[in-house]
Swiss-Prot record:
This is Alpha-1,3-galactosidase A. Belongs to the glycosyl hydrolase 110 family. A subfamily. It is an enzyme of class 3 (hydrolase). Alpha-galactosidase that specifically removes branched alpha-1,3-linked galactose residues present in blood group B antigens. Has no activity toward linear alpha-1,3-linked galactose residues. It comes from Bacteroides thetaiotaomicron (strain ATCC 29148 / DSM 2079 / JCM 5827 / CCUG 10774 / NCTC 10582 / VPI-5482 / E50). Keywords: Glycosidase, Hydrolase, Repeat, Signal. The lineage of its organism: Bacteria, Pseudomonadati, Bacteroidota, Bacteroidia, Bacteroidales. It comes from the Bacteria. It holds the Pfam family Beta_helix. It catalyses: Hydrolysis of terminal, non-reducing branched (1->3)-alpha-D-galactosidic residues, producing free D-galactose; Hydrolysis of terminal, non-reducing alpha-D-galactose residues in alpha-D-galactosides, including galactose oligosaccharides, galactomannans and galactolipids. GO terms for molecular function: alpha-galactosidase activity.
């Protein structure tokens, strides 16, 4: 009877539609059954259509699958990287999930969706939210000499045991952790002291109103909002793995789990008209544990457009590859490699036929190139590569080498997006292929609006930029340098990046800020036709706002400086 009333298969002309209806207590089972029917179409185009409503996906009924995901958590912090998945698509093709305005409500610490080895998948027209977000929020109602009185957001669950405060939900809890502060007037956030630090005693004055006592006077302002979390990225909001031809369209990500949407070794991904921000009217000010979109080791075109990114705890968009360190030459054509950063390991980073570059991690310059004949993940931390040709003795004698997978590097377009309420950067990008950042607005980034990196000794996020245009963007009240090109080369032996154009942008400088653009180790840099609005009457020429270090073939021309009075 359930299949008749809650899942219907209809054929109109040559299209197939599988309908899903909300049913209390059975939503996750009904969705799984609809996806099974879609899989039975064997790659023929099919739409899974949700009847409008709220679908609650419970952690206890989720698909539990082990995944190692870039930039998440270490094996010490999370010995079991099993993900609890609400919407699970595995080896499926040509399927559209149309939410028709429905909400997928996660109940517990969960990964809202996974697309694994899929092709031609469209997710559109729905909302993703969490019943009890893993980031809690409180607002300061009163401050005294040794106390705060705070209002707890209704979605934040707490318990008080022996006068000690603990936040909790299904699958998670924390007592200490990390905090970020939000100011309603300036519409800005920053990393800050946490009201959980040095907390002596907690008393519940009434439901969701707490008295927090300290040894010393808390240095906070009235109506400050604290966003608190632990540091463990043991789930992600979404995971696109080894997939291609993926479209995320018109999705409201009201909350993004313990990390954002991670795209890993996938190709041709489009994000269009998506909203990464708290639900309007919810009273929440934060929408994400860390990054909103993390693109790691992808290829093809990454196209992110017409979207809003508001309320992250880290960079809203981060696009990079992964440097693995050479730890042993097994022979002249066999290498042992290691994932070096605690949060990134466990997945295949190289495949047969891939082009690779061996890189001096201190200078970030290429010392050798080759093709992969065979690749094997021997442990979650180590890979072995067999190369198609032997390496020279000169290369094998070098120390501190890392390897980038050149085949898995994407083209990028990031256009017509809005970024706000972010304590870090707006966009971090390191890819060698043609990239365009155009028509975006960045408001109140506490660090750079755009950051061009590359490193082989810290985060091990690769690689060099070879063709990047930053055009017609507006930067309002951002940290400096507003555009930062700062590869982490410890020794300068030549340019790391090349062919970067920064043109026709609008920079509205904040008070006491004097660096719009800072560039390091670039060959071929064009900075032209930008308009810099300054609060400083003594700085009135372009050279006052542009800094260069070890750059060659630089053209700086026709940039104007004007006074403004927006951010005094």
């Amino acid at each position: 009877m359930m299949s008749v009333w809650f899942i219907q298969l209809a054929i109109f002309a040559q299209s197939r539609i599988i309908e899903v209806f909300p049913e209390q207590g059975k939503d996750i089972e009904n969705i799984a059954l609809a996806l099974k029917k879609a899989a039975d179409c064997k790659g023929r185009p099919v739409t899974v259509k949700f009847s409008p409503g709220i679908y609650q996906l419970d952690r206890a009924k989720s698909s539990q699958v082990l995944y190692y995901i870039s930039n998440t958590t270490s094996e010490l912090d999370d010995p079991d990287p099993t993900k609890h998945i609400g919407l699970y698509l595995n080896t499926l093709k040509n399927i559209t999930i149309d939410g028709c305005g429905s909400t997928l409500l996660m109940n517990g610490e969960m990964t809202s969706f996974v697309l694994d080895k899929c092709e031609g998948i469209v997710l559109k027209n729905f909302n993703i939210d969490y019943k009890h977000p893993t980031q809690t929020e409180v607002e300061v109602l009163e401050e005294g000499n040794d106390y705060l009185i705070v209002q707890v957001h209704p979605t934040s669950q707490y318990r008080i045991v022996d006068a000690q405060l603990e936040w909790y939900g299904d699958g998670w809890s924390f007592k200490n952790g990390i905090a970020q502060s939000y100011d309603r007037i300036s519409e800005m956030t920053w990393r800050s002291w946490s009201p959980m630090e040095n907390l002596l005693r907690t008393v519940e004055l009434r439901p969701n109103v707490l008295y927090l006592q300290y040894k010393e006077k808390p240095q906070v302002g009235l109506h400050t909002i604290f966003q608190m979390r632990d540091s463990f990225r043991d789930e992600v909001s979404g995971f696109v793995n080894r997939s291609k031809g993926i479209l995320l369209e018109n999705i409201n990500f009201y909350y993004l789990g313990n990390f954002g949407v991670v795209c890993q070794y996938s190709e041709n991904i489009t994000v269009d008209r998506c909203n990464f921000a708290p639900r309007p009217g919810s009273g929440r000010t934060n929408a994400g544990f860390a990054d909103f979109i993390q693109v790691s080791g992808c290829r093809g075109m990454i196209d992110i457009k017409n979207s809003r990114f508001i309320g992250a705890h880290d960079d809203p968009i981060n696009i990079h590859g992964t440097h693995l360190r050479v730890i042993e030459f097994l022979s002249d054509n066999r290498l042992k490699l290691r994932f070096m950063h605690d949060q990134t390991f466990g997945f295949e980073a190289f495949f047969k036929g891939d082009d690779i570059e061996l890189v001096d991690s201190r200078s970030l310059l290429v010392v050798g190139k080759c093709k992969v004949k065979e690749a094997k993940l021997v442990t979650p931390r180590e890979m072995e590569l067999t190369l198609s040709s032997p390496l020279s003795s000169e290369v094998m004698q070098q120390k501190d080498l890392v390897i980038e997978n050149v085949t898995w590097t994407p083209e990028v377009r990031i256009t017509n997006n809005y970024f706000a309420r972010v304590p870090t950067r707006g966009i971090l990008i390191t890819t060698r292929r043609k990239s365009l950042i155009e028509g975006n607005t960045f408001y109140g980034m506490q660090m750079s609006g755009i950051f061009v990196a590359d490193d082989g000794l810290s985060w091990y996020e690769s690689g060099p930029v070879h063709d990047l245009t930053i055009r017609q963007n507006t930067f309002l009240n951002c940290g400096e340098p507003i555009i930062s090109i700062d590869p982490e080369n410890r020794e300068y032996k030549g340019a790391v990046h090349k062919n970067i154009t920064i043109e026709e942008n609008y920079f509205y400088m904040r008070k006491n800020s004097s660096c719009a653009i800072r560039a390091k180790a670039v060959d071929g840099l064009m900075i032209r036709h930008n308009l810099i609005y300054s609060l400083d009457t003594e700085k009135n020429k372009e050279s006052d706002f542009i800094q260069m270090y070890n750059c060659n073939e630089v053209t700086i021309k026709e940039n104007r400086v004007q006074l403004h009075h927006l951010f005094k």
